[in-house]
Amino acid sequence: MRPPEFWNHREGRDAAPMIRALLSPISWIYGWAAARRIKTTESYDVGLPVICVGNATLGGTGKTPVVIYLLKSLRRLGIEAVGLTRGYGGQEKGPMPVHKNHTAADVGDEPLLLARHAPVWVSAGRDDGARAARSRGAKIIVMDDGHQNPQLEKTLTFLVVDAEMGFGNGCVFPAGPLREKLNPSLERADAVILMKPSPDYDIDEHLTQQLKGQIVIPAYLAPSTTPPRGKLYAFAGIGRPNKFFDSLRRHGGDIVEEMPYADHYKYKDEDIESLFLLASEYEASLITTEKDHVRLPKGYRKGVHSWPVSVVFEDELTLRRLLHPIIEQAQPKK
């Protein structure tokens, strides 16, 4: 689903007040159900530190690079940190570890990306996945996208917020992008990772006020390499494809055309063949995100550029201060 434009506007004609009013009863029910589930579900204590990386809104905010950063950092310290995810878009319900022969159709695209850096478990029931991971020697669990999931007791919760979109119009789905009411979502977070489009981006004053009283760690996504030379035909099926296109341009990519797809879009052979044909009209090469690249049919991947990014924290000291008690608890004793 592509998010409607009125989700991004708080007032005026672009905010579509009539549509918002019509949707508000459904939003109330959705928000009530989310709050009730969180309040009434007894969280399971797996006996290990659990770091949750979540968000308050629907769509992409940059959670996956944050999870990768945490997994790599913890494992560099000799800690057996593992990822835990629902496996959105995959058919396997788990609990099961992700293996190299799995496809996005099996476990989803995000688990495949995470599994390049650390062991990852896919489980529809997060509590079941945590138990399974612990039985295989996990010492810390990093849970991807579990802020609204109360099944597992969390030790530390990071809420990733897109600095450009913020919390949209501040309404709960479907009248807005929020997964639940904003205040409870912020109250359960230990810190907010504010994902900026670039290091010099100025944060909106309204968003600054909304985050008042929160521990805020500014961050941004930086490419691991420069864009390929020559003309590029860019495509992406992520939460906000324009972020990928804009970033490519900002770093010098010569984009002649762009093609957005729905988030987690399952590419078929004919999709890629059509893209190759369109790119050839411009004498351009195809480029996409890492997350899209793992969803491409295997036979086409070599012909498509993948442009990886990683997260850069502007206040790494605060991040490490928050992680320190967990590291102390899980680090192997000498």
Predicted regions and their residues:
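Phosphate/Mg2+-binding loops and adjacent switch elements
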Residues: G87-L211
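Residue-level signal for inorganic ion chemistry
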Residues: I29, T64, L114, D144, ...
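Conserved beta-strand elements of the Class I
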Residues: E80-L84, L159, K231-F235
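Short, flexible loop segments at boundaries between secondary-structure elements
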Residues: A262-Y265, K302-P332
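Walker A (P-loop) phosphate-binding motif
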Residues: A35-K100
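Hydrophobic residues at beta-strand termini and immediately following loops
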Residues: V53, L84, W121, V161, ...
